[in-house]
From Swiss-Prot:
Plays a role in cell envelope biogenesis, maintenance of cell envelope integrity and membrane homeostasis. Required for the normal cell elongation. May participate in the cell division process. Important for the septum site localization of the essential divisome protein ZipA. (Microbial infection) Probably transports the toxic C-terminal region of CdiA from E.coli strain 869 across the inner membrane to the cytoplasm, where CdiA degrades DNA. Toxin transport is strain-specific, mutations in this gene do not confer resistance to several other tested CdiA toxins. The chain crosses the membrane at residues 22-42, 50-70, 76-96, 121-141, 149-169. The keyword Membrane applies. Disruption phenotype: Deletion mutant is shorter than wild type and shows abnormal localization of ZipA, an essential protein of cell division. Deletion mutant is sensitive to low osmolarity. Disruption confers resistance to cellular contact-dependent growth inhibition (CDI) CdiA of E.coli strain 869, but not to a series of other CdiA toxins tested. PANTHER family: INNER MEMBRANE-SPANNING PROTEIN YCIB, INTRACELLULAR SEPTATION PROTEIN A-RELATED. InterPro entries: YciB. The keyword Membrane applies. It comes from Escherichia coli (strain K12). This is Inner membrane-spanning protein YciB. Belongs to the YciB family.
Amino acid sequence: MKQFLDFLPLVVFFAFYKIYDIYAATAALIVATAIVLIYSWVRFRKVEKMALITFVLVVVFGGLTLFFHNDEFIKWKVTVIYALFAGALLVSQWVMKKPLIQRMLGKELTLPQPVWSKLNLAWAVFFILCGLANIYIAFWLPQNIWVNFKVFGLTALTLIFTLLSGIYIYRHMPQEDKS
C-alpha cells in the first residue's frame, strides 16, 4: 500500500501532463502529494521524513514553476531531491559514522559493517548519477522525453537498483538469516 501511495503523485503528474500540459501536471502533482501526505497522517498517524521533504520540495519548486510559468523549476526538483538523498547518505557515513541505510534497515538485517558502508555509498552514487542524468535530459532534450524519463526511466532504474541491492544484501547475510 505504501509503495502505491508513494507512486500515486507520479501517476497523476503523468496523466495530467498527457491530457493537459506541464503546468496542469505540476499543480496536480502538488495536490496529489498533499493528499497522500494527509492520508498517510490520518491512516498511519505518521509521516516519514523523506515524504515530508519531498512534499516541501514539490510545493516550493512546483509553486515556482506555476508562479513564473517556467518549467525549469519542476525539472530541477528531481535533481535537488536526489542531491539531498545522496548528501544525507554521505554525511551519515562520513560524519555520523553510521550509514543511513544501516539506520533504516539495521533492525531487520544483520550485515557486516563494510557491507553497510558499501551499500550506503552505492546508493549515494546512484542518486548522484540519477540527478546528473536528470539535468542532462531535462535541459538538453524535449520536455516530453524528460517527463517519460522522470516517470518511467527513473522508476525503472530505482527498481533495478533496489533489486541489485537486495541480491547484494542476500549474498552477505549470515547463513542463519537466509532461511
